[in-house]
Amino acid sequence: MPIDEATQAAVHALWEAGTRHGRPPAPVPEADPWDASDVDGSADALDTARGRVSVLFDGSPSLVVHLHRDGRDTVRVEDVVDLDVPRRDLAAVVEALLVGRARRRPTVRGFLGNLLGVLLSNPAPSDLVVRVGGEDGSAPREYDGPVLMAAPLSGWLMSLPVED
């Protein structure tokens, strides 16, 4: 199954964003961002059932970007948060995560809310929030996803500032 040019361009943009911050992604065999002749890709490496290409950024935070044919992509952060991001903002969201421009937004308040979170095995019930855009006069866009705590807790996620 061939990889379309938009997906190829997205892989290239992700590679550039990661390289700018010293975190180039793992090689993507089905979409070599530097080989213009590789637009057709490799059917073996591509998830043909869902038509997706995965781009992995090792380190902290650990990021896995799933590029889907329809352009509605997903960024998985530290294996506990999924952000649904349209293709136009994908590289900006990844770059914001790589440089630490993300925040946690508490989803409960007060002693009882936090106690309930602890009892339900989520000691810090919150959403991960990433804001992008707005620099060029356009309205900033916000992407968020629930922080689903799993053992072991992510030190990177827990160290993020909390929104007021």
Where in this protein do the model-derived segments appear?
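Conserved short hydrophobic interaction patches
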Residues: A17, H21, V93-G100
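N-terminal "first-domain core" detector
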Residues: M1-R50
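Long, highly charged amphipathic alpha-helices
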Residues: A9-A13, D89-A96
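Acidic, proline/glycine-rich low-complexity IDRs
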Residues: I3, E95-D164
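Short linear motifs in intrinsically disordered
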Residues: G41-A45, G59-R69, G110, N114-S121
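Intrinsically disordered, low-complexity regulatory segments enriched in Ser/Thr/Pro
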Residues: R50-D89, D136-D164
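Residue-level marker of intrinsically disordered, low-complexity segments enriched
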Residues: M1, S37, G51-V53, V75, ...
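Alpha-helix boundary/N-cap detector
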Residues: P2-E5, A9, V81, V85-D89, ...
